[in-house]
């Protein structure tokens, strides 16, 4: 694709600068791409066929957040795929967006208000929400600006914010429809409650942490006086009451029963009897339920239905009263004894334990390790709390009027993976997805926050609820129901993940039946970390399929999490986070220390974090540029594994960018100003070899993208550019340009520029900035761009392997030449010859091959001359055997040292021969191994045997 336009960001008359400076290139080219509309949907390489849609949705980052290493990794993968498919000719759509991030954003703004000694309650809801919008406008563009720094070729006119009017409309429509279908309901349920934020918290946002606690053993006296039981040893024992063990003695104030196992013979005769609830003026019954473990403790537990999830289910089964004894901020309420009312939960624990001991109800206290649930946002210990909440029914069959009648939204989501409409990469994540959906509970979607999508439900004065798209519609429903008077809107907001789950279809205009919705749903692939498979991936599948009948995406590529070099999770509290922009632009040590120690939840950690930072980064972090960071991320992208990020890898890929830059300068110096059009010219075996290797690279890159093996893509590009093109072909090309005929020089110059141009297109999805800058110069010489025309590598056809260009003969010839060069270099190394010391080489073997290779050997092995002879002279000079050739350096040698070297080589060859004979003498190997493998082993044996014969001959010539 070429655009005629006057503005060209490259000075075509200016030579390529001596060094690669990424900062200037990156800013210039990103703005230019966006201005030209290359990122827009419908913009693609013309292939002559109807372009297929290729769609990726951003996992929307928090609007108030900043870029972290996970974003950098995720964006590299997504943008690499989008750029690749754009160059393939697909109609690419890369949809950017940000999430309003209810809890996270509200916490940030509340902290700002706290610093001013103002609470959100002082402001009131309306003013507080205005403050949040102000904060969003101030900071919301930060993360999208950082995403642009990474080169994300997103369709920015489609950018959304999950609280935008169009997105909010889709949220309300989904809620109303699900409610009308009986799949959203309101009920009093036990939920995880954050007493600091005063909101319900998703089960998935609970972090369980092992802590050292205590187990309190408490006596509950029988109302009827002591009772006799037969213990597990058959002894008759008289009990004053039942003893239970608990880690939370303060919750006993809300006990509704004691419970034993129905088959426990010790207590069967006690079922239905009453016990006194210590410290409280009431009695509770002894009941039986299968969930009790008769072998744990005394085999008796207390049932506190309103403050324990297991107890809640048991209480419902047995109609035990649910007594709430905590206020929403975790203080004892009016349902507790007066002496404890108003106490904070941990103060209440101390007071309850002291009173139990004083009244001789406390039997004993033991140390006990326990799992403590904490909110992942605040770190506060969560409280099971019985509250009115809104839920999505996950297992209820959908009614006849829906797209999947008779099936629950969970069932439909499971089927989509089972029948292959959605595929996970790697496959094992499908098992995790299935396990979670098969054990799912109804989803609590209400949050007691002020920032978010307010639930579209209104209440009349007598408590009737009207769920509607607007207050006007709710009023109409109320009038139709004969309800007069004002309506009050539900103050709660929706779980952030509810609106995020609608992104696959609301971003394309749903609930309207838009052309975009029909064309771009489903997305091609979702790229995500495994940590949000449950939060986001499964919920997108459920809601997209229920509301539209389509899967949200065809593939789910699940990548690992970025950790530090020691494998530790990156977190602000550990002080081991890295800001990707700091890797792009660089940061000095003092700036890095300030960044890592600012705003810590625990300021006492600052000293240790500063010390560690100064030790790890004594010189700060150098500027690597975006391309080096992207190449690093791609090279790390193995399927599903966590990534231990090492800064040295960035340094290595920055060196790669420098290598590519310098190689391009060399190629341009040797090709600019030469007429390279047409098909004339003579291709050497080296020219044909590098073109043949290019076909293998193109095939490997295509496989890598298809299999989501970005590490293979990156490694293949690295090996070809560094090892084959730069280290070998450029050196061979120098010889051909200096010593070849005009036809050979033309063939070499053409090969140099054409292969480089193809490499720049191949590498563009991974390293877009440097490839664009270099391609502008290279394409002019390669005939891919005309002077003055505006074009971009980003919309050039992606190279595809051509089997006709594979040349096995040329590959074998260069492999032989490489072996000879390396053999002579090894001889030079063993002789401690300096690079400046050029010595003659005498070569015995196939005359045509050695004569052809002679000029290359002389240049690459730093030889003064190469003489091809029928037989090597009898001289005490070092010799290397390479296939059918014997190569002698014509220098004075230390005979003893050369004998030792040959003895070592003889021992190595004898070892290889013994191994090969062992394999071929093993009947099992010969019978079971593929025929090609057996033949390969025979060929190896023959080669080693022939080489050993020649080396022994050389050893004999040298004598003792």
Curated annotation (Swiss-Prot):
Its EC number is 6.1.1.9. ATP binds at residue 572. Catalyzes the attachment of valine to tRNA(Val). As ValRS can inadvertently accommodate and process structurally similar amino acids such as threonine, to avoid such errors, it has a 'posttransfer' editing activity that hydrolyzes mischarged Thr-tRNA(Val) in a tRNA-dependent manner. A motif ('KMSKS' region) lies at residues 569-573. One of its GO terms (biological process) is valyl-tRNA aminoacylation. It is found in: Cytoplasm. It comes from Bordetella parapertussis (strain 12822 / ATCC BAA-587 / NCTC 13253). This is Valine--tRNA ligase. Residues 893-955 form a coiled coil. InterPro entries: aa-tRNA-synth_I_CS, aa-tRNA-synth_Ia, Anticodon_Ia_Val, M/V/L/I-tRNA-synth_anticd-bd, Rossmann-like_a/b/a_fold, tRNA-bd_arm, tRNAsynth_Ia_anticodon-bd, Val-tRNA_synth_C_sf. A motif ('HIGH' region) lies at residues 61-71. GO terms for molecular function: aminoacyl-tRNA deacylase activity; ATP binding; valine-tRNA ligase activity. The lineage of its organism: Bacteria, Pseudomonadati, Pseudomonadota, Betaproteobacteria, Burkholderiales. It comes from the Bacteria. Keywords: Aminoacyl-tRNA synthetase, ATP-binding, Coiled coil, Cytoplasm, Ligase, Nucleotide-binding, Protein biosynthesis. GO terms for cellular component: cytosol. ValRS has two distinct active sites: one for aminoacylation and one for editing. The misactivated threonine is translocated from the active site to the editing site. It catalyses: tRNA(Val) + L-valine + ATP = L-valyl-tRNA(Val) + AMP + diphosphate. Monomer. Belongs to the class-I aminoacyl-tRNA synthetase family. ValS type 1 subfamily.
């Amino acid at each position: 694709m070429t655009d005629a336009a006057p503005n060209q960001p490259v000075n075509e008359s200016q030579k390529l600068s001596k060094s690669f400076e990424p900062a200037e290139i990156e800013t210039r080219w990103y703005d230019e791409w966006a201005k030209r509309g290359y990122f827009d949907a419908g913009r693609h390489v013309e292939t002559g066929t109807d372009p297929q849609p290729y769609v990726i949705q951003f996992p929307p980052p928090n609007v108030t957040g900043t870029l972290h290493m996970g974003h950098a990794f995720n964006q590299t993968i997504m943008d690499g795929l989008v750029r690749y498919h754009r160059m393939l000719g697909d109609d690419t759509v890369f949809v950017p967006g940000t999430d309003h991030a209810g809890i996270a954003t509200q916490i940030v703004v509340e902290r700002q208000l706290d610093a001013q000694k103002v609470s959100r309650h002082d402001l009131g809801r309306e003013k507080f929400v205005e403050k949040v919008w102000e904060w969003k406008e101030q900071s919301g563009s930060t993360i999208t600006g950082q995403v642009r720094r990474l080169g994300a070729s997103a369709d920015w006119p489609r950018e959304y914010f999950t609280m935008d009017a169009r997105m909010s409309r889709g949220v309300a429509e989904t809620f109303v429809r699900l409610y009308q279908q009986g799949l959203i309901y309101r009920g009093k349920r036990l939920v995880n409650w954050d007493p600091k934020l005063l909101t319900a918290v998703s089960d998935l946002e609970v972090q369980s942490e092992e802590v050292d606690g205590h187990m309190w053993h408490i006596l509950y006296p029988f109302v009827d006086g002591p009772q006799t039981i037969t213990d597990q040893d058959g002894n008759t024992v008289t009990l004053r009451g039942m003893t239970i063990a608990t880690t939370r003695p303060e919750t006993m104030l809300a006990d509704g029963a004691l419970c034993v196992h129905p088959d426990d013979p010790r207590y069967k005769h006690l079922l239905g009897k009453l016990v006194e609830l210590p410290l409280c003026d009431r009695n509770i019954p002894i009941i039986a339920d299968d969930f009790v473990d008769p072998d744990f403790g005394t085999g008796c537990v207390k049932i506190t239905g309103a403050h324990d999830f297991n107890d809640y289910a048991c209480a419902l089964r047995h109609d035990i009263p649910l007594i709430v004894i905590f206020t929403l901020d975790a203080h004892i309420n009016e349902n507790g004894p007066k002496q404890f009312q108003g106490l904070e939960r941990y103060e209440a624990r101390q007071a309850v334990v002291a009173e139990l001991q004083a009244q001789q109800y406390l039997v004993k206290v033991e140390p006990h390790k326990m799992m403590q649930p904490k909110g992942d946002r605040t770190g506060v210990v969560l409280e099971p709390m019985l509250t009115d909440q809104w839920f999505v029914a996950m297992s209820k069959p959908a009614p006849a009027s829906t797209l999947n009648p008779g099936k629950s939204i969970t069932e439909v989501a499971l089927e989509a993976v089972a029948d292959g409409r959605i595929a996970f990469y790697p496959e094992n994540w499908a098992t995790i997805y299935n396990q979670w959906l098969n054990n799912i509970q109804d989803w609590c979607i209400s949050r007691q926050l002020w920032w978010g999508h307010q639930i579209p439900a209104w209440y009349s004065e007598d408590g009737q609820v009207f769920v509607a798209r607007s207050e006007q519609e709710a009023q109409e429903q109320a009038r139709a129901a004969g309800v007069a008077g004002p309506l009050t809107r539900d103050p709660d907001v929706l779980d952030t993940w509810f609106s995020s789950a609608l992104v696959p279809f609301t971003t394309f205009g749903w609930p309207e039946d838009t052309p975009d919705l029909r064309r771009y749903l489903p997305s091609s692939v979702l790229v995500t970390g495994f940590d949000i498979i449950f939060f986001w991936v499964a919920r997108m599948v459920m809601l997209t399929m229920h509301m539209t009948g389509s899967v949200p995406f065809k593939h789910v590529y699940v990548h690992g999490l970025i950790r530090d070099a020691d494998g530790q999770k990156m977190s602000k509290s550990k002080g081991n986070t890295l800001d990707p922009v700091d890797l792009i632009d660089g940061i000095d040590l003092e700036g890095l220390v300030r960044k890592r120690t600012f705003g810590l939840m625990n300021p006492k950690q600052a000293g240790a974090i500063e010390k560690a930072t100064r030790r790890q980064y004594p010189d700060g972090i150098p500027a690597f540029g975006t391309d080096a960071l992207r190449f690093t991320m791609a090279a790390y992208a193995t399927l599903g594994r966590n990534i231990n990020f090492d800064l040295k890898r960035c340094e290595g890929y920055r060196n790669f960018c420098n290598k590519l830059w310098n190689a391009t300068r060399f190629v341009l110096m040797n090709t600019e100003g030469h007429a390279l059009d047409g098909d004339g010219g003579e291709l050497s075996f080296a020219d044909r070899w590098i073109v043949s290797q290019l076909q293998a690279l193109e095939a490997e890159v295509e496989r890598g993208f298809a299999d989501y093996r970005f590490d293979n893509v990156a490694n293949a590009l690295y090996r070809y550019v560094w090892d084959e093109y730069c280290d070998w072909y450029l050196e061979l090309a120098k010889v051909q340009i200096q010593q070849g005929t005009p036809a050979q020089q033309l063939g070499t110059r053409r090969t140099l520029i054409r292969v480089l141009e193809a490499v720049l297109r191949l590498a563009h999805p991974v390293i877009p900035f440097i490839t664009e800058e270099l391609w502008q110069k290279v394409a002019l010489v390669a005939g891919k761009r005309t002077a003055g025309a505006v074009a971009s590598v980003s919309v050039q056809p992606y190279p595809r392997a051509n089997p006709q260009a594979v040349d096995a003969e040329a590959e074998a010839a260069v492999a032989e030449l490489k072996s000879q060069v390396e053999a002579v270099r090894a001889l030079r190394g063993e002789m401690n010859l300096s690079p400046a010391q050029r010595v003659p080489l005498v070569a015995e073997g196939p005359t045509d091959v050695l004569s052809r290779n002679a000029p290359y050997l002389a240049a690459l092995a730093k030889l003064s001359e190469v003489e091809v002879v029928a037989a090597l002279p009898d001289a005490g000079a070092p010799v290397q055997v390479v296939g059918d050739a014997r190569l002698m350096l014509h220098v004075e040698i230390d005979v003893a040292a050369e004998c030792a070297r040959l003895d070592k080589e003889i021992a190595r060859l004898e070892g290889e021969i013994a191994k090969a004979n062992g394999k071929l003498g093993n009947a099992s190997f010969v019978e079971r191994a593929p025929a090609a493998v057996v033949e390969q082993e025979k060929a190896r044996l023959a080669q080693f045997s022939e080489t050993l014969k020649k080396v022994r001959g050389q050893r004999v010539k040298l004598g003792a």
